[in-house]
Curated annotation (Swiss-Prot):
GO terms for biological process: ribosomal small subunit assembly; translation. This is Small ribosomal subunit protein uS19. It comes from Variovorax paradoxus (strain S110). Belongs to the universal ribosomal protein uS19 family. Coiled coil: none annotated. Protein S19 forms a complex with S13 that binds strongly to the 16S ribosomal RNA. GO terms for cellular component: cytoplasm; small ribosomal subunit. The keyword Phosphoprotein does not apply. Gene3D superfamilies: 30s Ribosomal Protein S19, Chain A.
Amino acid sequence: MTRSLKKGPFVDHHLVAKADKAVTTKDKKPIKTWSRRSMVLPEFIGLTIAVHNGKQHVPVYITDQMVGHKLGEFALTRTFKGHPADKKVQKK
């Protein structure tokens, strides 16, 4: 189920404050955040936000096509290393 339009997008207040400060000072350093649940706003376009994936902060450059999505969508939390090789099957 999607979020109701009358509620508006959810963004943590500290993230909005850091983004506004970065825009006014034209700071290019990544903004570190643990808030994967925050939605990408149009004010974030052009900023680099380092989203925590549970282990490290993944830098995400915000483009106009990301607006409306959650930050957590762009920092994957699971890594797939492949299935183990079957020892019974011998390659010819």
